[in-house]
Amino acid sequence: MLNSWPLAKDLQVLVEIVHSGSFSAAAATLGQTPAFVTKRIQILENTLATTLLNRSARGVALTESGQRCYEHALEILTQYQRLVDDVTQIKTRPEGMIRIGCSFGFGRSHIAPAITELMRNYPELQVHFELFDRQIDLVQDNIDLDIRINDAIPDYYIAHLLTKNKRILCAAPEYLQKYPQPQSLQELSRHDCLVTKERDMTHGIWELGNGQEKKSVKVSGHLSSNSGEIVLQWALEGKGIMLRSEWDVLPFLESGKLVRVLPEYAQSANIWAVYREPLYRSMKLRVCVEFLAAWCQQRLGKPDEGYQVM
């Protein structure tokens, strides 16, 4: 058992080093000297009896223990800020502009109505909501919060899991009456596949897993689009096999308008809130992330529900 608990200010120093990339830059952000930052990290490492950071000529890197500490520190500092907001009973309300990005399909069907409800609760906020058909750079595209259906999040961003999701193979009964249902991934190459140019997917390559292994399958067909809504309509019309998010096709599976193809296979496509600034620094960012998490979990299920595909 530890002789003492890590101090919140030391956890904050660690977070600032990770985000700024150096001890000196973290010191400038905190309004302290580099010597102060070095001292606080030494105290934190002594308290936890482990090395958190490796320093070299190329910069600073987290150790395995440091990565764990950093992830917990983000949660703890956010909880601290929430405690301060609640206990002091300050009537501060989140206000000002926040820029939110998302893909077209999920943005229209889920995030847009969520933002409408968000504004009812926090009318002092100003929201600019932008839809993209490509993977974006938060800095270059001037986005504060991006909602991504993709597990490959760059290390220089912070990601909060909103809910689990997977993409599944589907086709209309009409199509499967004309063509024999594929019995293996390899047989997909013989079918008309409706290819969607997703933000995170290589065009014409479907990566699918069954919980034990993951395979990349090259597919093609007569129809393709960068609009998931159009591809869904084509599938309903019996034009081919598509790979779509479960949230998008569930009503049609339940009604029988679509059926699963190779149901043992799926593609992991969890839904994340992605941002650069730690939540404890920004009330408006924290409020938006927490609201969207609650919204998605209420409608799509909590993060611990369902299964994780490879």
From Swiss-Prot:
This protein's UniProt keywords: Activator, DNA-binding, Transcription, Transcription regulation
Highest taxon of source: Bacteria
PROSITE patterns: HTH_LYSR
Molecular function per GO: DNA-binding transcription factor activity; sequence-specific DNA binding
DNA-binding region: 23-42
Pfam family, one: HTH_1
Domain HTH lysR-type, residue spans: 6-63
Entry-linked SUPFAM superfamilies: Periplasmic binding protein-like II, Winged helix' DNA-binding domain
GO BP annotations listed: DNA-templated transcription
Transmembrane segments: none
PANTHER family associated with the record: HTH-TYPE TRANSCRIPTIONAL ACTIVATOR TTDR-RELATED, HTH-TYPE TRANSCRIPTIONAL REGULATOR
Role played: Positive regulator required for L-tartrate-dependent anaerobic growth on glycerol. Induces expression of the ttdA-ttdB-ygjE operon.
Family to which this protein belongs: Belongs to the LysR transcriptional regulatory family.
Name of the molecule in the record: HTH-type transcriptional activator TtdR
Gene transcribed to yield this protein: ttdR
